[in-house]
Swiss-Prot record:
Primary localization class, coarse: nucleus
Compartmental location: Nucleus; Chromosome; Cytoplasm; Cytoplasm, Cytoskeleton, Cilium basal body
Domain notes: The 2 PHD-type zinc fingers are required for transcriptional activity.
Species of provenance: Mus musculus
Official protein name in the record: Protein Jade-1
Location of cross-link Glycyl lysine isopeptide (Lys-Gly) (interchain with G-Cter in SUMO2): K115, K573
Entry GO terms, CC: centrosome; ciliary basal body; cytoplasm; cytosol; histone acetyltransferase complex; nuclear speck; nucleoplasm; nucleus
Length: 834
């Protein structure tokens, strides 16, 4: 069913549009209506919203119609239809459009907004700034000098008289710069066109690499648009000929390098593998040691370092310069040298022969053999080489004429080109058009004509040279400077890399030195620990105090002395190594001496019964034997120490090998003296009472210090005289590690044999006829040695044993087996510790 509603205005439709209306809304609408009705000007509305039209369009649901005659409103927008249709009621109230003409305002400066217009890459992104390239282009490159300023002043006075506007300095600079730029561009174009046409249609033009004038399909002759060299595609490695202009490698990079193998500048050149050096392709082909990396691209030039020094030393016979690498004549027994490019310039015969195995051979001939090879071409290569020397004499008068013909033609061709270039330079003003310059700069033609005449005169005065440097040359110079900067940076990095390598080597050497020091300290610490253990064991076992003082002297023999004549650190290092070696030998010598004593005891047999009568004699003499070995070791150390001090006083420095020889010689002298004395004293008869009495005296001397010491006067020392003079020998510093190998470790079999020999000697209880070394305390021996050194100018002589010492040594011949085994253990410990 349709809903019946009263006609209402727009406000009524707004208030009654929905079924859920409230009292507050009606009250609000009534207030609003009353306010509108009470307006001072009662105007009719220009439009109303009519709902009757919508109501008339609605039909009852039971109305019979065809489905094609009506539409069913099923969308939520249905309620909006009930608000009515907007209908104008008073057309007179509609406002009429009115237009009036406004005066044109002056155009303001356009400010580019950041948001809508994007700036290009060359322009700065920030407002208020100018791009550096734009600023550089706007700056004039020509500056007025005093002559220009004076001419401008005179010209402005004439312009005032003529009623023309004055000319400022900036305008004059711009016009002169435009003249120079247009003259440079047009002249270069004319030169390239003129020379290009001349070379292209010249029948004598040849390839700069192979010197062949012929071109083939797929191997065209290409000309460089800048330096005008002509090369084949295959000769220069041009894979594809470009449609436009083509530049060679040197012109493309803007460099003018020198060839590494010849003195000629320019030409078809290719870089080496490093890219910093350049070589002519023809030089690389004709010099046998040089090769090319990629034959397709004909670059880079490689194996330049394989050229022998003999080739670098050759002097060119054509230019008389010792530069680069020259080649020699291919004729047998002819050694004439010349550069490849010099041979091409002089027109020498240079042949390229293709062998059967697709190998290319290059044959070059000197001026002497190039003149007569043309009539002999049919004879073959061998005949020409054999008959080259004798047949060259009759044709020698024709040689200068034949060699001058190509030179004259080349000189004529070069002179013609130079004349053309000079003519173009003299007519430089023809390459500038006044009308074009006036239009480009928006200046009057009269002003431009004044400046044009002044520009011609000034350039004529300057010998037709340009007033400003061309922009392209400036760019090339800038690029060259940048390249030089990069090259210097590369050199800096190379030197830095070398310095870092040196630092790395130094750190490695310092680390290795410190490791060696640490190993030396560890070994010294182990030796010191082992000596300490031995001292403790000797104290526990009850060794006399003289033995402990001997060991202390052994341990602290190389303590640095404080005084003006103190030895250096290097001498102390040598002493430590020397004493280690002496300690090892001295520990072995008492064992050998005991063998000899046992042998003498077995042979004599006079004291056998006394040893059986004294059952505790071997036990008592056990400590005496140990003290004997230690005292002999102490004496060896004292002698070596005095010898070194004497050498330091005299300023003699002996190398390691010399010290070892002196040590052996000293030991041999001691052994010889001992043998002689033992032979003399073996004939003296010994009584048992004397032996026992001497044994008791020796025991008291060993147990109580200072009682058994012999007087200095009783000791006899024979000092050998030295007839030679002392010579200072340069010392060779040796590593302390190498001087440790002074010990000789006996094998197991030798140690067992020594033990058995000592056991047999103790059981036989024979007499001892071998005399030992002096057993005086360390202090007395040191004093006597110092006196001997002062008397003999620093030499340490071998001392002879007195009779009392020989008699005391006879009492120490009988030993027990336990003493021998214990001494063997001490020797083993000292060897292991070292």
């Amino acid at each position: 069913m349709k809903r019946g509603r009263l006609p209402s205005s727009s406000e009524d439709s707004d208030d009654n549009g929905s079924l859920s209306t409230t009292w507050s809304q009606h009250s609000r609408s009534q207030h609003g209506r009353s306010s509108t009705c009470s307006r001072p000007e009662d105007r009719k509305p220009s439009e109303v919203f009519r709902t009757d039209l919508i109501t008339a369009m609605k039909l009852h649901d039971s109305y019979q119609l065809n489905p094609d005659d009506y539409y069913v409103l099923a969308d939520p927008w249905r309620q909006e239809w009930e608000k009515g249709v907007q209908v104008p009621v008073s057309p007179g109230t509609i406002p009429q459009p009115v237009a009036r003409v406004v005066s044109e305002e002056k155009s303001l400066m356009f400010i580019r907004p950041k948001k809508y217009i994007a700036s290009s890459g060359s322009e700065p992104p920030a407002l208020g700034y100018v791009d550096i390239r734009t600023l550089a282009d706007s700056v004039c490159r020509y500056d007025l000098n005093d002559m220009d300023a004076a001419w401008l002043e005179v010209t402005n006075e004439e312009f005032k008289e003529m009623g023309m506007p004055e000319l400022d300095e900036y305008t004059m600079e711009r016009v002169l710069e435009e003249f120079e730029q247009r003259c440079y561009d047009n002249m270069n174009h004319a030169i390239e066109t003129e020379e290009g046409l001349g070379i292209e249609y010249d029948e004598d033009v040849v390839c700069d690499v192979c010197q062949s004038p012929d071109g083939e399909d797929g191997n065209e002759m290409v000309f460089c648009d800048k330096c005008n060299i002509c090369v084949h595609q295959a000769c220069y490695g041009i894979l594809k000929v470009p449609e436009g202009s083509w530049l060679c490698r040197t012109c493309a990079l803007g460099v003018q390098p020198k060839c590494l193998l010849c003195p000629k500048k320019g030409g078809a050149m290719k870089p080496t593998r490093s890219g910093t050096k350049w070589v002519h392709v023809s030089c690389a082909l004709w010099i046998p040691e040089v090769s090319i990396g990629s034959p397709e691209k004909m670059e880079p030039i490689t194996k330049v370092s394989h050229i022998p020094s003999s080739r670098w030393a050759l002097v060119c016979s054509l230019c008389n310069e010792k530069f680069g690498a020259s080649i020699q004549c291919s004729v047998k027994n002819c050694r004439t040298a010349f550069h490849v490019t010099c041979a091409f310039d002089r027109g020498l015969e240079m042949k390229t022969i293709l062998a059967e195995n697709d190998e290319v051979k290059f044959k070059s001939y000197c001026p002497k053999h190039s003149s007569h090879r043309k009539p002999e071409e049919g004879l073959g290569e061998g005949a020409a080489q054999e008959n080259g020397a004798p047949e060259s004499s009759p044709q020698s008068p024709l040689e200068p004429y034949g060699s001058l013909e190509p030179n004259r033609e080349e000189a004529h061709r070069v002179s013609v080109r130079k004349q053309k270039l000079q003519q173009l330079e003299d007519e430089f003003y023809t390459f500038v058009n006044l009308l074009d310059v006036a239009r480009a700069l928006r200046l009057p033609e009269e002003v431009v004509d004044f400046l044009y005449q002044y520009w011609k005169l000034k350039r004529k005065i300057n010998f037709n040279k340009p007033l400003i440097t061309p922009k392209k040359d400036e760019e090339d110079n800038l690029a060259k400077r940048e390249q030089d900067v990069l090259f210097r940076r590369l050199q800096l990095f190379t030197h830095l890399r070398q310095d870092l390598e040196r630092v790395r080597n130094l750190t490695y050497m310092v680390t290795r030195r410190e490791k060696i020091k640490r190993s030396v300290c560890k070994v010294q610490e182990q030796i010191f620990t082992q000596y300490t253990k031995l001292l403790e064991q000797e104290k526990v076992s009850g060794v006399p105090s003289s033995c402990s003082s001997a060991l202390e002297n052994m341990l602290f023999f190389n303590s640095p002395s404080v005084g003006p004549n103190a030895p250096k650190i290097e001498d102390l290092k040598w002493h430590s190594a020397f004493f280690r070696k002496q300690m090892g030998t001295s520990l072995v010598h008492p064992l050998k001496k005991s063998h000899k004593r046992d042998a003498v005891q077995n042979s004599s047999g006079t004291e056998g019964k006394t040893s059986h009568k004294q059952p505790g004699l071997c036990g008592r003499r056990e400590g005496l034997e140990v003290s004997e070995s230690l005292l002999s070791l102490e004496k060896t150390f004292a002698e070596a120490r005095l010898l070194s001090s004497a050498q330091q006083k005299n300023g003699v420095v002996t190398p390691d090998h010399g010290k070892r020889r002196d040590n052996r010689f000293h030991c041999d002298l001691v052994k010889g003296d001992l043998k002689d004395k033992s032979f003399k004293q073996s004939h003296k008869p010994l009584r048992s009472t004397d032996t026992s009495q001497r044994h008791l005296d020796n025991t008291r001397a060993a147990t109580s210090p200072g009682v058994g010491q012999s007087a200095p006067g009783t000791r006899k020392e024979i000092v050998p005289k030295c007839n030679g003079s002392l010579v200072k020998v340069p010392i060779t510093p040796a590593s302390p590690v190498k001087s440790w190998g002074g010990f000789r470790i006996p094998k197991k079999g030798e140690r067992q044999q020594q033990g058995e020999a000592h056991d047999g000697a103790c059981h036989q209880h024979s007499d001892c006829s071998h005399l030992g070394v002096s057993r005086a305390p360390a202090k007395e021996r040191a004093k006597s040695r110092l006196r001997a050194d002062s008397e003999n100018d620093g030499y340490a002589p071998d001392g002879e044993m007195s009779d009392s010492e020989s008699e005391a040594s006879e009492k120490k011949c009988i030993h027990a087996s336990s003493t021998i085994s214990r001494r063997t253990d001490i020797i083993r410990r000292s060897i292991l510790a070292s």
